[in-house]
Amino acid sequence: MIEPLLCGIVLGLVPITIVGLFVSAWNQYRRESAMPDWE
């Protein structure tokens, strides 16, 4: 049987991890796409 605390931690960390990866990937893509504009 899964402990409520462990289940809560997993349900809380998973969305944060997904959002964190998406934001970091978007920032990297935006930085690379905007690089030619600075030159």
From Swiss-Prot:
GO terms for molecular function: electron transporter, transferring electrons within cytochrome b6/f complex of photosystem II activity. Component of the cytochrome b6-f complex, which mediates electron transfer between photosystem II (PSII) and photosystem I (PSI), cyclic electron flow around PSI, and state transitions. PetG is required for either the stability or assembly of the cytochrome b6-f complex. Its main location: membrane. GO terms for cellular component: cytochrome b6f complex; plasma membrane-derived thylakoid membrane. The chain crosses the membrane at residues 5-25. This is Cytochrome b6-f complex subunit 5. It is a single-pass membrane protein. SUPFAM superfamilies: PetG subunit of the cytochrome b6f complex. The 4 large subunits of the cytochrome b6-f complex are cytochrome b6, subunit IV (17 kDa polypeptide, PetD), cytochrome f and the Rieske protein, while the 4 small subunits are PetG, PetL, PetM and PetN. The complex functions as a dimer. InterPro entries: Cyt_6/f_cplx_su5, Cyt_6/f_cplx_su5_sf. Pfam families: PetG. The gene is petG.
